[in-house]
Amino acid sequence: MPRWGYSVKLRDESEVAKAVLRNVPVHPKIMAEVARAISGMRVDEARRYLRAVIEKREAVPFRRAHGKQAHRRGLADKWGWPVGRYPVKAARYMLKLLDNVEANAANKNLDVERLKIIHVAAHKGITLKRWMPRAWGRATPRNRVHSHIEIMVREV
């Protein structure tokens, strides 16, 4: 059995709420870009931003996984980087994670209105190996990569 933990160790966790989602069916590269975009935001601000991403009103800047990606209007002004996408599926899972961490914060008697994201990360999860049959008896691998997402918030 694997041993799960967080990638950040804190001395005092009394003012911090944590949450994690395991085996999310989104590639870790995409989840890492969404995590980088919301890192340091307040929870309500991150929620508004992710809803705008789902509605395709705001794009997420893709700084690492951006090969042959289009430039998006307004990204360079806000983020200083013109290349971006609208990762709707990743934003939905990140919203679910924000709901979880907000509930955990309420359970620890933290003020939900004043929560700020201090850490968010995406790590590689399991890979489901599949094979797609091709012509002449060949087969091509079709791997489905999953992600683990973790988040920590603190009351400010």
From Swiss-Prot:
The keyword Manganese does not apply. InterPro entries: Ribosomal_uL22 (IPR001063), Ribosomal_uL22_CS (IPR018260), Ribosomal_uL22_euk/arc (IPR005721), Ribosomal_uL22_sf (IPR036394). GO terms for biological process: cytoplasmic translation. Keywords: Ribonucleoprotein, Ribosomal protein, RNA-binding, rRNA-binding. GO terms for cellular component: cytosolic large ribosomal subunit. This protein binds specifically to 23S rRNA. It makes multiple contacts with different domains of the 23S rRNA in the assembled 50S subunit and ribosome. The globular domain of the protein is located near the polypeptide exit tunnel on the outside of the subunit, while an extended beta-hairpin is found that lines the wall of the exit tunnel in the center of the 70S ribosome. NCBIfam families: PRK04223.1 (NF003260), uL22_arch_euk (TIGR01038). Part of the 50S ribosomal subunit. This is Large ribosomal subunit protein uL22. It comes from Aeropyrum pernix (strain ATCC 700893 / DSM 11879 / JCM 9820 / NBRC 100138 / K1). The gene is rpl22.
